[in-house]
Amino acid sequence: SRAIIKIKKKYKNKIGIMCDVALDPYTSHGHDGLIDKKEILNDKTIQILIKQSLLQAQMGCDVIAPSDMMDGRIGEIRRALDKNGYEKIQILSYAVKYSSSFYGPFRDAVGSKKALKGDKKTYQMDFSNIDEALREVALDIREGADMVMVKPGLPYIDVIKEVKNKFKIPVLAYQVSGEYSLISNAIKNKILSNDAIYESLLSLIHI
């Protein structure tokens, strides 16, 4: 929140700020929601996500980006923002966030891999099921999402293309730590040239 204030004070509206909304950076167990008896408490988690979103909006965030994957959180956050006078704040939904092995290097870097108990397959997306992804995008748009994310990016270019063609809204792709590590390690071992980084990012843009 302090960073948002400082950036907005210095650059005014010359730069837009997107703010991630999730609980996993703050939970002792590494999950994106509150847990009771090994069960994710979806609705109670959403109430905290709403408070987080309102605080970020109050500080000057331009785009709220819920990455938690709780069911129904887009609609609840949209209603809370509108009710409190933040109608112009946009929502980027991590609508298609797969339960992916490609997050590994990031979790190692921030120390959440050791804290994480179990996996996130009960609330993140099944990467073998594209129909589920399309249904989730449609649902989040109905709830008020202004744009959607597909994460990871490169392994799911077909999903990005399908979402973009079907829904005609801004679609963002996230090149995650595992994707980048594959390429950077190949560069370090002189299997690929540095141009591979640029090529991998451009491939996500031109679709």
What annotation goes with each model-predicted range?
Residues 1-19, 71-97, 156-179:
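Alpha-helix-loop-beta-strand connector modules within alpha/beta enzyme cores
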Residues 1-52:
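Active-site beta->alpha loop and helix N-cap motifs at the rims of alpha/beta catalytic domains
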Residues 29-48, 113-134, 183-198:
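Active-site mouth loops of central-metabolism enzymes
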Residues 45, 62-70, 124-129, 146-154:
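Catalytic beta/alpha-barrel core
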Residues 135-148:
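Oxyanion-binding "anion nests"
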Residues 205-207:
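Conserved small/polar residues in nucleotide/adenosyl-binding loops
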